[in-house]
Structures are given as C-alpha cells and as structure tokens.
C-alpha cells in the first residue's frame, strides 16, 4: 500500500484515553490511557530493565507499584514533559511510525487557553519534526462523524464536557458552553459514595478499579426519585463486582447515583447546571431561527455519554425545558466513544482539507501563533 507512507496521523488526546491511528481508517489503531506512571519505590534488582517512567497500558498493568498521573486535566495539558512522553509513546510504540514523515491532526477542547494549542504546535514541529499539523475542535469532529453539518454536540469525556452548536459546518463560538464535570469527577464521586458503604478506595491505582466498576455497572435513571425508591425497597438493582484480590463487593443505588451528578452537579458540591440545562442554554444562545435544527440534531459524543439510559433521560429533560411543540431528537451513535477520532479521520482524508494543514515552512516563518490563524 503506497499511500500508507503519507497517510496523516490522527491523535485524539483525551484527558482519560488517547486515541490514535491513521486518517482514512474507520477506527483508531491504538487506544490507551493518557497516564504516565513513576515507580513509588527504589528498584533493588539489577538488570531488571526497570524504567523511570511507564506510559499507557504498561503503566496501568504495573499500577500497583507506580504513582499514576494524568498530564491532561479538564482537557488542558498541565504537564508538558509527561505529554511529550505520551506522544513519543504514541508514535514510536503504538503506531510505530516516524512522526517526521506524516502530517499530524491533533484535537482539543473548545475554549482552551491559546497557550495550550501554541505549545502543542511547537512540540510537534520542534520535538517531533512533523512536516505538517493541524489542531481541530473535538465536538466539530464528532458532528462530522455523525454525517451532519448542523447540530449541537454534547461532548463529555474524562476531563471536560462541552456543548457546541454548529450550523452549516461553522461552530458558533458565542454559544459554546463548557462544564468542568466529566468522567474523572464521576469516578471520584463513586469512590466517595463507595467509601460510605464501607469499601475503601484511596490510591491512584484503586481509582482505576473504581473507574472500571463505573464503566461496567453504572447507568442513568429515567426518574431518579423513583429509582431511589425502587433501590430502597428491593435488591433488584444490586450487582456484584469482583475486585482484583478476589473480594466481591455489592453495589446498589450507587449504580445510578454516580452518573446522576451529570444532571445534578450539586451532588459534587458544584453550582453549575446539569448537562441537560447546559445543552438547552447553549441552544438558547443561538439565533432563534436555527434553534429548531439544533433541537432536532442533538448529538452525544465521548465516553461519559456511554451510560445506558442517558439518551432517554436527555430527551425527557430537554423536552421539559424546550417549547412544547418543539421536535427534539437525541442522537447517540453506538461508536460515540470514538466519534471525535472518527471525525478526525474523515477530516484529514478529505481532499479539500489538504490545503488547511500548517506546514513546517509556515511554522518556521510565523512561529507557534500560526495555529490561531489556520485552525479555527
């Protein structure tokens, strides 16, 4: 395959998972946790080939002896040295490519500080010597993946949730809303409410166990109060989970209390609106003429929208907020966990997109600020 040589790379750097692969593919080749782990103890056995840091799945599998750190918090890179390690791992270990031979499409959350994308640009050109790169907004890519050009995307990942109205392919920046409440906060909340049940989860490694419980057993209730009553009166909602050491724990109303925080952030002690209200507020910030199209094309994307029951609940909540005659449609594609990456794969392989890349030459002439002019 001669094209493989120049295929663009698409890297969706999430706060929780990094999704990477080649433009034109229908799914990412590599999906691994955005984690860098460092040993908690001194190595005592010489010749074991111990490293001073581990990335991704390897960090995850050795988590018992490591301190795990996520370099991306709420969609913003907070530790650039670790971020470089993740990119290095992506290119050389996961995709096994030479970054100086491929254009690279990166993604970022909307309303990110400008310095964040400048630094991304700088590292790609100066550290990895990529021939060309581009930074795209995550939610816009999700809409591409759903085959639409108009709609509102409610994208919720591990670090940040945002609602982005898009009309005829243009994101409407004044109406984008961002909520720093996402998967990681729900994991922390589940750790807290499991502690109330008498199970103790405290370390960074144990947090990963709780994340797994959350992903396997949690769901969104259509009617929270009613579900609480059901849970109190019978054990029909209880499920058990086996911990790595063989101990079995039982989880009941925590299953839906945890993701309920998306609709009631007050559970986490936050004063913000829930995801349904944020979506509604975002639509209300748009021109009155286009709202109908947004209500009818509300697209969910990101891993935190994977809970069973979330689409029905969104439908119910937004119907309650919107005018009574409005047609409301919540679109929850089955592949929405990866729809940002899929959208990036579509975008980077379009012939019309090829003139959009920032080239190494343009970067050398203008410096990192070129990214604001070419990527919008």
Swiss-Prot record:
- Residues annotated as carrying Methionine (R)-sulfoxide in the record are 45, 48
Q: Does the keyword field hold ATP-binding? A: yes
Q: According to its UniProt record, how is this protein modified after translation?
A: Oxidation of Met-45 and Met-48 by MICALs (mical1, mical2 or mical3) to form methionine sulfoxide promotes actin filament depolymerization. Mical1 and mical2 produce the (R)-S-oxide form. The (R)-S-oxide form is reverted by msrb1 and msrb2, which promote actin repolymerization.
Q: Which InterPro entries match?
A: Actin, Actin/actin-like_CS, Actin_CS, ATPase_NBD
Which reactions is this enzyme annotated as catalysing? ATP + H2O = ADP + phosphate + H(+)
Q: Does the keyword Nucleotide-binding apply?
A: yes
UniProtKB keywords: ATP-binding, Cytoplasm, Cytoskeleton, Hydrolase, Nucleotide-binding, Oxidation
What top-level branch of life does the organism fall under? Eukaryota
**What are the GO MF terms of this UniProt record?**
ATP binding; hydrolase activity; protein kinase binding; structural constituent of postsynaptic actin cytoskeleton
What Gene3D superfamilies does the annotation carry? 3.30.420.40, Actin, Chain A, domain 4 (3.90.640.10)
Task: Please tell me one Gene Ontology term that the record gives under cellular component.
Answer: synapse
| Gene Ontology biological process | axonogenesis; cell motility
Q: Which cysteines are joined by disulfide bonds?
A: none
Q: Where in the cell is it found?
A: Cytoplasm, Cytoskeleton
Q: Which SMART domains match?
A: ACTIN
Enzyme class, broadest EC rank:
hydrolase
Report the EC number(s), separated by commas if there are several: 3.6.4.-
Instruction: Please explain the role this protein plays, according to its UniProt record.
Output: Actins are highly conserved proteins that are involved in various types of cell motility and are ubiquitously expressed in all eukaryotic cells.
Q: Give the quaternary structure.
A: Polymerization of globular actin (G-actin) leads to a structural filament (F-actin) in the form of a two-stranded helix. Each actin can bind to 4 others.
Family statement: Belongs to the actin family.
Record-given protein name = Actin, cytoplasmic type 5
Q: What is the scientific name of the source organism?
A: Xenopus laevis (African clawed frog)
Q: What is the lineage of its organism?
A: Eukaryota, Metazoa, Chordata, Craniata, Vertebrata
């Amino acid at each position: 395959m001669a094209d493989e040589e120049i295929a663009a790379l698409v890297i969706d750097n999430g706060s929780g998972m990094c999704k990477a692969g080649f433009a034109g593919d229908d799914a990412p080749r590599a999906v691994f946790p955005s984690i860098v782990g460092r040993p908690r103890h001194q190595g005592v056995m010489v010749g074991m080939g111990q490293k001073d840091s581990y990335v991704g799945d390897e960090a995850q599998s050795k988590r018992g002896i490591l301190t795990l750190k996520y370099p991306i918090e709420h969609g913003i890179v907070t530790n650039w040295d670790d971020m470089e390690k993740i990119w290095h791992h992506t290119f050389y270990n996961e995709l096994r490519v030479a970054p100086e031979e491929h254009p690279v499409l990166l993604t970022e959350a909307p309303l990110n500080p400008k310095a964040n994308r400048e630094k991304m640009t700088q590292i790609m050109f100066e550290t990895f010597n990529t021939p060309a790169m581009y930074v795209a907004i995550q939610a816009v890519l999700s809409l591409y993946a759903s085959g639409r050009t108009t709609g509102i995307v409610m994208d919720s990942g591990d670090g940040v949730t945002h609602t982005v109205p898009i009309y005829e392919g243009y994101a409407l920046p004044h109406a984008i809303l961002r909520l720093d409440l996402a998967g990681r906060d729900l994991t922390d909340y589940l750790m807290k409410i499991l502690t109330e049940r008498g199970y103790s989860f405290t370390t960074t490694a144990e947090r990963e166990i709780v994340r797994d419980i959350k992903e396997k057993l949690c769901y969104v209730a259509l009617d929270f109060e009613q579900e609480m009553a059901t849970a109190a009166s019978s054990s029909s909602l209880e499920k058990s989970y086996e911990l790595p050491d063989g101990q079995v724990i039982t989880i009941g109303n925590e299953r839906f209390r945890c993701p309920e925080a998306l609709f009631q952030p007050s559970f986490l002690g936050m004063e913000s609106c829930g995801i349904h209200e944020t979506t509604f507020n975002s639509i209300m910030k748009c021109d009155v003429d286009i709202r109908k199209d947004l209500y009818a094309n509300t697209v969910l994307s990101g891993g935190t929208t994977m809970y069973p029951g979330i689409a029905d609940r969104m439908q119910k909540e937004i119907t309650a907020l919107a005018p009574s005659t409005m047609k409301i449609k919540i679109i929850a594609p089955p592949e929405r966990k990866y729809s940002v990456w899929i959208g990036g794969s579509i975008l980077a392989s379009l012939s019309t997109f090829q003139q959009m890349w920032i080239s190494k030459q343009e970067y050398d002439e203008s410096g990192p600020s070129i990214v604001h002019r070419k990527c919008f």
